[in-house]
Protein backbone atom coordinates (compact mmCIF):
# COMPACT_ATOMS: atom_id res chain seq x y z
CA UNK A 1 0.00 0.00 0.00
CA UNK A 2 1.40 3.38 -1.04
CA UNK A 3 0.68 6.73 0.60
CA UNK A 4 2.25 8.66 -2.28
CA UNK A 5 0.19 11.25 -4.15
CA UNK A 6 1.32 12.49 -7.57
CA UNK A 7 2.01 16.10 -6.58
CA UNK A 8 5.10 18.01 -7.67
CA UNK A 9 6.68 20.40 -5.19
CA UNK A 10 6.51 23.18 -7.78
CA UNK A 11 2.69 23.08 -7.90
CA UNK A 12 0.29 24.90 -5.61
CA UNK A 13 -2.57 22.75 -6.89
CA UNK A 14 -2.95 19.70 -9.11
CA UNK A 15 -5.20 19.90 -12.16
CA UNK A 16 -6.99 16.87 -13.58
CA UNK A 17 -8.35 17.12 -17.11
CA UNK A 18 -11.63 15.22 -17.52
CA UNK A 19 -12.20 15.81 -21.25
CA UNK A 20 -11.85 12.10 -22.03
CA UNK A 21 -14.34 11.09 -19.33
CA UNK A 22 -16.82 13.91 -18.67
CA UNK A 23 -16.51 14.84 -22.34
CA UNK A 24 -17.75 11.38 -23.18
CA UNK A 25 -21.26 12.49 -22.14
CA UNK A 26 -21.16 15.32 -24.68
CA UNK A 27 -19.84 12.97 -27.36
CA UNK A 28 -22.33 10.22 -26.49
CA UNK A 29 -19.41 7.95 -25.57
CA UNK A 30 -18.08 7.78 -29.15
CA UNK A 31 -14.36 8.39 -28.59
CA UNK A 32 -11.91 6.55 -30.82
CA UNK A 33 -8.39 5.41 -30.00
CA UNK A 34 -7.01 7.97 -32.45
CA UNK A 35 -8.84 10.82 -30.71
CA UNK A 36 -7.64 9.69 -27.30
CA UNK A 37 -4.04 9.52 -28.48
CA UNK A 38 -4.23 12.99 -30.03
CA UNK A 39 -5.84 14.61 -26.98
CA UNK A 40 -3.60 12.90 -24.44
CA UNK A 41 -0.53 13.87 -26.46
CA UNK A 42 -1.58 17.52 -26.54
CA UNK A 43 -2.56 17.71 -22.87
CA UNK A 44 0.56 15.87 -21.76
CA UNK A 45 2.70 18.18 -23.86
CA UNK A 46 1.10 21.19 -22.18
CA UNK A 47 1.99 19.85 -18.74
CA UNK A 48 -1.41 18.59 -17.57
CA UNK A 49 -0.45 16.25 -14.70
CA UNK A 50 -3.52 13.96 -14.61
CA UNK A 51 -5.86 12.92 -17.43
CA UNK A 52 -9.04 10.95 -16.72
CA UNK A 53 -10.21 8.36 -19.27
CA UNK A 54 -13.36 6.19 -19.14
CA UNK A 55 -16.95 6.01 -20.28
CA UNK A 56 -18.75 9.14 -19.09
CA UNK A 57 -20.40 7.18 -16.28
CA UNK A 58 -17.18 5.44 -15.31
CA UNK A 59 -15.92 1.89 -15.66
CA UNK A 60 -18.66 -0.45 -16.81
CA UNK A 61 -20.86 2.45 -17.89
CA UNK A 62 -21.30 1.23 -21.46
CA UNK A 63 -24.89 0.01 -21.32
CA UNK A 64 -28.41 0.47 -22.63
CA UNK A 65 -29.27 2.86 -19.80
CA UNK A 66 -26.24 5.15 -20.10
CA UNK A 67 -25.21 4.71 -23.71
CA UNK A 68 -22.86 2.27 -25.40
CA UNK A 69 -19.20 3.11 -26.01
CA UNK A 70 -17.95 3.09 -29.58
CA UNK A 71 -14.59 1.79 -28.35
CA UNK A 72 -14.19 -0.33 -25.19
CA UNK A 73 -13.00 1.96 -22.43
CA UNK A 74 -10.14 -0.32 -21.43
CA UNK A 75 -8.72 0.08 -24.95
CA UNK A 76 -8.94 3.85 -24.52
CA UNK A 77 -7.20 3.67 -21.14
CA UNK A 78 -4.41 1.56 -22.60
CA UNK A 79 -3.97 3.98 -25.52
CA UNK A 80 -3.82 6.93 -23.12
CA UNK A 81 -1.16 5.27 -20.98
CA UNK A 82 0.91 4.39 -24.04
CA UNK A 83 0.72 7.99 -25.28
CA UNK A 84 1.41 9.93 -22.08
CA UNK A 85 5.01 10.70 -21.22
CA UNK A 86 4.58 12.53 -17.92
CA UNK A 87 0.86 12.67 -17.17
CA UNK A 88 -0.75 10.03 -14.98
CA UNK A 89 -3.90 8.36 -16.29
CA UNK A 90 -6.91 8.22 -13.97
CA UNK A 91 -10.21 6.39 -14.25
CA UNK A 92 -13.62 6.88 -12.66
CA UNK A 93 -15.85 4.19 -11.25
CA UNK A 94 -19.26 4.23 -9.59
CA UNK A 95 -19.83 1.32 -7.17
CA UNK A 96 -22.78 -0.68 -8.38
CA UNK A 97 -22.14 0.23 -12.00
CA UNK A 98 -18.48 -0.67 -12.24
CA UNK A 99 -17.18 -3.68 -10.33
CA UNK A 100 -13.93 -4.37 -8.52
CA UNK A 101 -12.59 -6.45 -11.41
CA UNK A 102 -12.82 -3.33 -13.59
CA UNK A 103 -10.38 -1.58 -11.24
CA UNK A 104 -7.90 -4.44 -11.57
CA UNK A 105 -8.11 -4.42 -15.38
CA UNK A 106 -7.69 -0.64 -15.57
CA UNK A 107 -4.58 -0.86 -13.42
CA UNK A 108 -3.24 -3.72 -15.53
CA UNK A 109 -3.68 -1.42 -18.53
CA UNK A 110 -1.48 1.17 -16.85
CA UNK A 111 -3.85 3.58 -15.08
CA UNK A 112 -2.55 4.64 -11.68
CA UNK A 113 -5.24 6.86 -10.11
CA UNK A 114 -8.59 5.41 -9.05
CA UNK A 115 -11.43 7.91 -8.67
CA UNK A 116 -14.52 6.49 -6.95
CA UNK A 117 -17.81 8.39 -7.09
CA UNK A 118 -20.94 8.12 -4.97
CA UNK A 119 -23.96 10.28 -4.35
CA UNK A 120 -23.07 12.77 -1.62
CA UNK A 121 -25.08 10.87 1.03
CA UNK A 122 -23.81 7.39 0.14
CA UNK A 123 -20.06 7.40 0.79
CA UNK A 124 -20.33 4.08 2.63
CA UNK A 125 -20.84 2.17 -0.64
CA UNK A 126 -17.27 3.07 -1.65
CA UNK A 127 -15.49 1.52 1.34
CA UNK A 128 -14.63 -1.84 -0.25
CA UNK A 129 -13.49 -0.24 -3.48
CA UNK A 130 -11.13 2.17 -1.74
CA UNK A 131 -9.74 -0.76 0.22
CA UNK A 132 -9.00 -2.71 -2.94
CA UNK A 133 -7.47 0.29 -4.70
CA UNK A 134 -5.12 1.07 -1.82
CA UNK A 135 -4.14 -2.59 -1.41
CA UNK A 136 -3.10 -2.57 -5.07
CA UNK A 137 -1.05 0.60 -4.66
CA UNK A 138 -3.33 2.90 -6.62
CA UNK A 139 -3.68 6.54 -5.71
CA UNK A 140 -7.26 7.17 -4.61
CA UNK A 141 -9.69 10.03 -5.11
CA UNK A 142 -13.29 10.21 -3.88
CA UNK A 143 -16.18 12.02 -5.54
CA UNK A 144 -19.14 13.25 -3.47
CA UNK A 145 -21.54 13.99 -6.30
CA UNK A 146 -24.45 16.46 -6.27
CA UNK A 147 -22.71 18.28 -3.43
CA UNK A 148 -25.15 21.19 -3.65
CA UNK A 149 -27.94 19.03 -2.24
CA UNK A 150 -26.73 18.72 1.37
CA UNK A 151 -25.23 21.28 3.78
CA UNK A 152 -21.46 21.56 4.34
CA UNK A 153 -21.40 19.83 7.73
CA UNK A 154 -23.18 16.74 6.38
CA UNK A 155 -20.90 16.68 3.34
CA UNK A 156 -17.88 16.75 5.65
CA UNK A 157 -19.15 13.69 7.53
CA UNK A 158 -19.45 11.80 4.26
CA UNK A 159 -15.92 12.88 3.34
CA UNK A 160 -14.70 11.41 6.63
CA UNK A 161 -16.15 8.02 5.65
CA UNK A 162 -14.18 8.08 2.40
CA UNK A 163 -10.95 9.22 4.05
CA UNK A 164 -11.19 6.53 6.72
CA UNK A 165 -11.68 3.96 3.95
CA UNK A 166 -8.39 4.97 2.29
CA UNK A 167 -9.32 7.89 0.06
CA UNK A 168 -6.41 10.33 -0.32
CA UNK A 169 -8.38 13.26 -1.74
CA UNK A 170 -12.11 13.88 -1.38
CA UNK A 171 -13.79 16.08 -3.96
CA UNK A 172 -16.70 18.45 -3.59
CA UNK A 173 -18.43 17.58 -6.87
CA UNK A 174 -20.86 20.14 -8.26
CA UNK A 175 -22.46 17.66 -10.65
CA UNK A 176 -25.30 20.03 -11.49
CA UNK A 177 -23.23 23.20 -11.77
CA UNK A 178 -25.60 24.60 -9.15
CA UNK A 179 -23.20 25.92 -6.51
CA UNK A 180 -22.43 29.62 -6.30
CA UNK A 181 -19.08 30.94 -5.00
CA UNK A 182 -19.57 31.09 -1.20
CA UNK A 183 -21.44 27.78 -1.34
CA UNK A 184 -18.30 26.23 -2.83
CA UNK A 185 -16.06 27.88 -0.24
CA UNK A 186 -18.27 26.74 2.63
CA UNK A 187 -18.17 23.12 1.50
CA UNK A 188 -14.46 23.04 0.75
CA UNK A 189 -13.65 24.70 4.09
CA UNK A 190 -15.83 22.18 5.92
CA UNK A 191 -13.97 19.28 4.31
CA UNK A 192 -10.55 20.84 4.95
CA UNK A 193 -11.42 21.29 8.61
CA UNK A 194 -12.79 17.76 8.93
CA UNK A 195 -9.98 15.95 7.09
CA UNK A 196 -6.94 17.96 8.18
CA UNK A 197 -3.84 16.09 7.09
CA UNK A 198 -5.73 12.83 6.55
CA UNK A 199 -6.68 13.65 2.95
CA UNK A 200 -6.57 16.46 0.45
CA UNK A 201 -9.71 18.22 -0.77
CA UNK A 202 -10.66 18.73 -4.42
CA UNK A 203 -13.34 20.48 -6.46
CA UNK A 204 -15.11 19.48 -9.69
CA UNK A 205 -17.30 22.14 -11.29
CA UNK A 206 -19.62 22.63 -14.25
CA UNK A 207 -20.52 25.66 -16.31
CA UNK A 208 -24.32 25.46 -16.06
CA UNK A 209 -24.50 28.84 -14.32
CA UNK A 210 -21.33 30.13 -15.99
CA UNK A 211 -19.28 29.86 -12.80
CA UNK A 212 -16.93 26.95 -13.47
CA UNK A 213 -13.69 28.94 -13.29
CA UNK A 214 -14.86 31.34 -10.57
CA UNK A 215 -16.06 28.46 -8.39
CA UNK A 216 -12.77 26.63 -8.92
CA UNK A 217 -10.81 29.70 -7.80
CA UNK A 218 -13.11 29.98 -4.77
CA UNK A 219 -12.29 26.34 -3.99
CA UNK A 220 -8.54 26.97 -4.25
CA UNK A 221 -8.78 29.95 -1.90
CA UNK A 222 -10.77 27.81 0.54
CA UNK A 223 -8.01 25.18 0.64
CA UNK A 224 -8.64 22.77 -2.24
CA UNK A 225 -5.45 21.15 -3.55
CA UNK A 226 -6.88 19.32 -6.56
CA UNK A 227 -9.09 20.89 -9.24
CA UNK A 228 -10.88 19.30 -12.19
CA UNK A 229 -11.58 20.89 -15.52
CA UNK A 230 -12.02 19.97 -19.16
CA UNK A 231 -10.13 21.61 -21.96
CA UNK A 232 -12.55 23.58 -24.17
CA UNK A 233 -15.28 22.87 -21.55
CA UNK A 234 -15.55 19.34 -23.04
CA UNK A 235 -17.98 17.84 -20.54
CA UNK A 236 -21.59 17.21 -19.58
CA UNK A 237 -24.18 19.98 -19.52
CA UNK A 238 -22.61 23.31 -20.42
CA UNK A 239 -19.28 21.58 -19.85
CA UNK A 240 -16.69 21.70 -17.09
CA UNK A 241 -14.50 24.59 -16.06
CA UNK A 242 -12.28 25.16 -19.13
CA UNK A 243 -8.74 24.17 -18.17
CA UNK A 244 -7.16 26.76 -20.46
CA UNK A 245 -9.11 29.62 -18.86
CA UNK A 246 -8.53 28.29 -15.34
CA UNK A 247 -4.78 28.04 -15.96
CA UNK A 248 -4.74 31.57 -17.35
CA UNK A 249 -6.50 32.91 -14.26
CA UNK A 250 -4.15 30.96 -12.00
CA UNK A 251 -1.17 32.47 -13.79
CA UNK A 252 -2.57 35.96 -13.25
CA UNK A 253 -3.17 35.47 -9.51
CA UNK A 254 0.06 33.58 -8.84
CA UNK A 255 -1.27 30.05 -8.35
CA UNK A 256 1.18 27.51 -9.79
CA UNK A 257 -0.30 24.63 -11.81
CA UNK A 258 2.70 23.46 -13.84
CA UNK A 259 0.63 23.82 -17.03
CA UNK A 260 1.82 26.01 -19.91
CA UNK A 261 -0.98 28.47 -20.68
CA UNK A 262 -0.12 28.94 -24.35
CA UNK A 263 0.30 25.21 -24.97
CA UNK A 264 -3.03 24.34 -23.33
CA UNK A 265 -4.75 27.13 -25.30
CA UNK A 266 -3.33 25.61 -28.50
CA UNK A 267 -4.44 22.13 -27.43
CA UNK A 268 -7.97 23.41 -26.82
CA UNK A 269 -8.23 25.05 -30.23
CA UNK A 270 -6.27 22.69 -32.45
CA UNK A 271 -6.79 19.22 -30.94
CA UNK A 272 -9.73 19.08 -28.53
CA UNK A 273 -12.21 21.19 -30.50
CA UNK A 274 -11.98 19.00 -33.65
CA UNK A 275 -12.92 15.96 -31.53
CA UNK A 276 -16.08 17.63 -30.20
CA UNK A 277 -19.40 17.12 -32.03
CA UNK A 278 -20.21 20.75 -31.20
CA UNK A 279 -19.21 23.35 -28.62
CA UNK A 280 -20.51 22.89 -25.08
CA UNK A 281 -23.03 25.70 -24.77
CA UNK A 282 -24.58 27.57 -21.90
CA UNK A 283 -27.97 27.33 -23.57
CA UNK A 284 -31.46 27.24 -22.06
CA UNK A 285 -31.34 23.54 -21.19
CA UNK A 286 -27.92 23.73 -19.53
CA UNK A 287 -28.95 26.85 -17.64
CA UNK A 288 -32.05 25.09 -16.33
CA UNK A 289 -29.88 22.27 -14.98
CA UNK A 290 -27.75 24.68 -12.99
CA UNK A 291 -30.77 26.62 -11.78
CA UNK A 292 -32.80 23.54 -10.81
CA UNK A 293 -29.86 21.44 -9.59
CA UNK A 294 -30.02 18.62 -12.14
CA UNK A 295 -27.18 16.16 -12.77
CA UNK A 296 -25.28 17.49 -15.80
CA UNK A 297 -25.23 14.19 -17.72
CA UNK A 298 -29.04 14.39 -17.95
CA UNK A 299 -28.77 16.96 -20.77
CA UNK A 300 -28.46 14.60 -23.74
CA UNK A 301 -31.00 12.18 -22.24
CA UNK A 302 -33.49 15.04 -21.75
CA UNK A 303 -32.99 16.32 -25.29
CA UNK A 304 -33.64 12.84 -26.66
CA UNK A 305 -36.84 12.29 -24.64
CA UNK A 306 -38.10 15.81 -25.37
CA UNK A 307 -37.78 15.18 -29.09
CA UNK A 308 -39.36 11.74 -28.82
CA UNK A 309 -42.42 12.90 -26.88
CA UNK A 310 -42.76 16.42 -28.26
CA UNK A 311 -42.26 18.26 -24.97
CA UNK A 312 -39.99 21.04 -23.71
CA UNK A 313 -36.54 19.80 -22.70
CA UNK A 314 -36.18 22.81 -20.38
CA UNK A 315 -39.42 21.96 -18.53
CA UNK A 316 -38.33 18.33 -18.44
CA UNK A 317 -35.11 19.31 -16.67
CA UNK A 318 -36.84 21.67 -14.24
CA UNK A 319 -39.19 18.90 -13.15
CA UNK A 320 -36.27 16.49 -12.82
CA UNK A 321 -34.75 19.01 -10.42
CA UNK A 322 -37.96 19.24 -8.40
CA UNK A 323 -37.98 15.45 -8.08
CA UNK A 324 -34.33 15.59 -6.95
CA UNK A 325 -33.30 12.93 -9.44
CA UNK A 326 -29.70 11.71 -9.23
CA UNK A 327 -27.32 9.91 -11.56
CA UNK A 328 -28.75 6.52 -12.46
CA UNK A 329 -32.33 7.77 -12.64
CA UNK A 330 -32.19 8.97 -16.23
CA UNK A 331 -35.00 6.58 -17.15
CA UNK A 332 -37.41 8.65 -15.04
CA UNK A 333 -37.14 11.38 -17.66
CA UNK A 334 -39.48 9.23 -19.74
CA UNK A 335 -42.10 9.32 -16.98
CA UNK A 336 -41.79 13.10 -16.75
CA UNK A 337 -42.03 13.47 -20.53
CA UNK A 338 -45.22 11.40 -20.57
CA UNK A 339 -46.59 13.50 -17.72
CA UNK A 340 -45.91 16.69 -19.67
CA UNK A 341 -47.45 15.16 -22.77
CA UNK A 342 -50.65 14.28 -20.88
CA UNK A 343 -50.86 17.77 -19.40
CA UNK A 344 -50.48 19.35 -22.82
CA UNK A 345 -53.21 17.13 -24.28
CA UNK A 346 -55.59 18.01 -21.44
CA UNK A 347 -55.09 21.77 -21.71
Swiss-Prot record:
Task: Tell me which Gene Ontology terms the entry assigns under biological process.
Answer: catabolic process; L-leucine biosynthetic process
User: Which InterPro entries would you find in this protein's record?
Assistant: 2-IPM_HCS-like, 4OH_2_O-val_aldolase, Aldolase_TIM, DmpG_comm, DRE_TIM_HOA, PYR_CT
**Keyword hit for Coiled coil:** no
Q: Where is the Pyruvate carboxyltransferase domain?
A: 13-265
HAMAP family (alphabetical):
HOA
Q: Which family does the record assign?
A: Belongs to the 4-hydroxy-2-oxovalerate aldolase family.
What's the protein called, per UniProt?
4-hydroxy-2-oxovalerate aldolase 1
Which species is the source of this protein?
Answer: Rhodococcus erythropolis (strain PR4 / NBRC 100887)
Taxonomic lineage of this organism?
Bacteria, Bacillati, Actinomycetota, Actinomycetes, Mycobacteriales
